[in-house]
């Protein structure tokens, strides 16, 4: 298998000759902040990073963060009705939620109980940076697949500006947004915005919820004070999200009518408050400082619990030569989940214990430049503490018998990375990166755990290339990931379903390719990724890792028909996969699909824009998720389906000034 990896590497590197001449830089001078808080150009990053800008998000007609990320090489978006989308980077499968670190303006928000991506309206997004197979040194525990950084729009240095929008669509969907910004004096910038959403959704509701709409409301307030060689920024976001959901469908139900209600129904209702603060200052030519801090508060009205978390990260950058520097950083996170309802234990009501998580970490990163060669090294030491409880149920009555307080201390979580980047032309670079990434069991994992508890360790090797030749940009890489003690949920035994560590190793080998061609009025995009996830030892030795498609692809085109009139079309493909929990490959693969989205917009010179579009143009029937049940009761072991949305249409109007 190593020979196959080397062959893939030769294929990638062999393409260098075709892109080795100087050419206009189309995308490679973008500055990214996810791999380095102080910012660095994409081509000077020895890591696989993708940037989805506000322009691309708008052109493809994305309605959510999940829509914006669709089609990115190596990225699969998973979603069940009533749950936040899960961003799967490089084949994590069903545990993707805890193997990807989600940042909002550089602040981790996917900590104690996860974060609902639906609460961030796309109208608020400046860009999304996707860092794959890296980020463990800066972000630590959980950065197994990588990092997704959602960067919202900062206040603009204008006297006054604003806008509003209204959209209507299928299933009685309405979206609206309004924003206003300006500056006070020469240094203080402000903006405020509101986004709203209501919908009856694609699938039928439980009868007791007929006629009720999902809704999301989000308010943002931002301020920025300009300093000499720096700035201070403060962001506040308040959001409410109510989502009615329904459960899975059996195969016949799914085939007959995927819109019908499932085996159960209910709703989620969350209220979020997020405060982020940033201070950056260039002290002199040698020293830069960066301080970030945040507070996240979530109240679940349906489950009646409160989650809150504090975060702070100071960083200092010392420049010791041209394009050479060392960064020292420290971060601290303190989170808890408070349960407001009592629980019944053997018929007696008592207070449910709270969950707590703390982490402390220090890290150092160095970058040294020698001519066209750049070398990076990083090391992180992290300590994670958990306090939680496991629940014991009577095997006959399923009555809660006991709550056992537990704690866990992971004191020696060491992550490190090494990278080499060669700038072989004014636009092209080829890189190698090695990362050791770690993941400790989450509180959700530990509450239903079987066997010894071990830290998951991933060793990630990657070779990649980026360049721009004439009117084409290219980004490609091959990777090899070896996972030890991988954490997963095993339900192959119908009488004992638990979280546990794999008793063997999991290997993932893959390649990614992204191309964009820019003509006078036309832009063409092709993106494809391939991954082979195999269990290489232990109980499931030789089996394919569950819930991971080998192939994903996106082909798209944007055409500026005339001044102001733009058309866009995107096609998406995902190949067959085993059910998300079918680790013994008991069932056959399935659920491959091709979908097409299209939209059209016209922007007038007076600031008004009209647009319309259709998602899933050909009304393709497929599932967002496929799981299984190993029940010994009739109808026995089988796969079950969570349908994706069918065809939907929308139209809207925007005004900006």
What are these regions (language model features)?
Residues 286-301, 423, 429-437, 455-536, ...:
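Membrane-embedded beta-barrel scaffold of Gram-negative outer-membrane proteins
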Residues 7-10, 19-20, 181-183, 193, ...:
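Conserved C-terminal beta-signal and adjacent last beta-strands/turns
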Residues 137, 149, 158-159, 165-167, ...:
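Periplasmic-side early beta-strands and strand-to-turn transitions of outer-membrane beta-barrels
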Residues 369-375, 384, 473, 479-482, ...:
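Gram-negative outer-membrane beta-barrel transporters
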